[in-house]
C-alpha cells in the first residue's frame, strides 16, 4: 500500500467559455510514502496554463513560479494528469482539506468534460482525519496544517 500526498498550486483565471473564474492548476506536486510512511518517491510538474495567460502577483509571490517557467517548462494539463495518474497507481490519494481535490476535479472537467477522476479510487482528506483524531469538531474553525504539526510535535525547521 502506498500513500500519495498531493499539493496543487493554481492561478485564478477567468474562463470566457464558462463565464466564471476557475482555479487553473499550474503545478502538481506529490510525495509517495510506503506502508511504513517512508518517502519512496516524489512528483513535480509545471502545467502550462490555457485559461489565463498571466499569473496574478499573489500567486507569483507565493509559489515563486514565473510566467516564463510555465511557458518554457509547463506541459498540458492532460499530459500532467496522465503522468500523475501513473505516479499515483493504486495508492491512496491524500490532501490537506478538500480544496486541492475540488481544483483537480474542476480542471479535469474543464479539459475532458468528465467530472469523475478515473484514476481516483481511494482518497483521504487529512485535515478531516486529523480533526477526528484530535477530537476537534468545531465546524466554525478548521485545523490548520501548521497547528496540527505543532500539536503532533513535528518540527518544520529546514535542514541546512
Residue ranges and their predicted role:
Residues 8-18:
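Short acidic, Gly/Ser-rich segments with clustered Asp/Glu that frequently serve as metal-coordination loops
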Residues 21-28, 32-63, 85-160:
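Metal-dependent phosphoesterase core characteristic of DEDDh/y 3'-5' exonuclease domains
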Residues 19, 70-73, 138:
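Alpha-helix initiation/capping motif
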Residues 60-83:
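Metal-dependent phosphoesterase signature
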Amino acid at each position: 500500500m502506498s500513500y500519495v500526498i498531493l499539493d496543487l498550486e493554481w492561478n485564478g483565471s477567468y474562463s470566457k467559455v464558462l463565464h466564471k473564474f476557475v482555479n487553473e492548476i499550474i503545478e502538481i506536486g506529490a510525495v509517495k510514502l510506503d506502508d511504513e510512511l517512508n518517502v519512496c518517491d516524489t512528483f513535480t510538474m509545471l502545467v502550462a496554463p490555457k485559461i489565463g495567460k498571466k499569473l496574478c502577483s499573489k500567486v507569483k509571490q507565493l509559489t515563486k513560479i514565473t510566467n516564463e517557467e510555465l511557458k518554457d517548462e509547463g506541459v498540458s494539463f492532460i499530459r500532467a494528469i496522465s503522468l500523475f495518474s501513473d505516479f499515483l497507481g493504486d495508492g491512496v490519494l491524500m490532501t490537506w482539506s478538500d480544496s486541492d481535490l475540488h481544483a483537480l476535479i474542476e480542471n479535469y472537467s474543464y479539459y475532458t468534460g468528465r467530472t469523475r477522476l478515473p484514476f481516483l479510487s481511494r482518497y483521504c482528506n487529512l485535515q478531516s482525519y486529523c480533526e477526528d483524531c484530535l477530537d476537534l469538531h468545531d465546524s466554525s474553525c478548521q485545523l490548520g496544517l501548521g497547528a496540527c504539526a505543532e500539536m503532533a510535535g513535528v518540527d518544520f525547521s529546514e535542514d541546512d
